[in-house]
Amino acid sequence: MKRFAGRPAIVTAAASGIGRAIALRLHEEGAQVLAVDIDDEGLAALPRSETLRTFVADVTAEGAPQAIVGECLRRFDGIRVLVNNAGLGNCPPFHETTEAEYRKYADINQKATFMITLAALPALTRSKGVVLNIASTLGLVGYRRQAVYSMAKAGVIGLTRNLAADYADQGIRVNAIAPGIIATPQTAGRLNTARFHATIVGTTPMGRPGRPEEIAGAAAFLCSDDAGFVTGQVLAVDGGQTSSAYISEALVQCWVDAHPDR
């Protein structure tokens, strides 16, 4: 028996990367998936079927949350799983951030998660469903030049914990995943530079970036009955990056070579 057999699921930002991997994994395990994205070409590349449908939407647009939820109810007559994956990184430094830029990053990284979950709440209450928010390790720790993004993702983590407390008595579970550096089309440009790749290897105990399928595996667990007693949790899937102040011997040696007098 597949873990998600007949269970309707919404996955946002599902045209590529982490969202695509989650949508395909849930569908592989039996879910009826509505894959949502603003990228119509990316959605068209998904292997659509009667149980894997696509919906083009800008999650930050007025009325989009209600439209997304309405489409899932129309297609599949319910919502059992909601995966809020839409996000936007590469924000400007704090001192260069305009109000318009702040709103752009806050809207997609935080407001969309809030509003889509709010729109889906009645259906999730009926189904005793699951919400999974894709946050970031930058919502757990500080990092240079990521103030707006980190603030938004920290807010998603706070929302996750509060919703878990608020709706546990109605049978709804709410968890989050905090991915580290994952090899996706969005990160390919940076990962393909030797310096950035060396830095990731040098600060991650597992010595490599993660794969979207590894986030999807964690997502499938948290959304399934196997995690039936898990709520309000944030699972870092980051190769151990946030578990310690890990620095590889190679990076230590680089520092020594650069400061031979110390």
What do the predicted segments below correspond to?
Residues 136:
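Residue(s) in the substrate-gating loop at a strand-loop-helix junction
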Residues 93-94, 101-103, 200:
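Substrate-binding pocket helix/loop in short-chain dehydrogenase/reductase
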Residues 117, 152, 160:
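Active-site helix of classical SDR
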Residues 95, 141-148, 169-170, 207, ...:
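Active-site loop immediately N-terminal to the catalytic Tyr-X3-Lys motif
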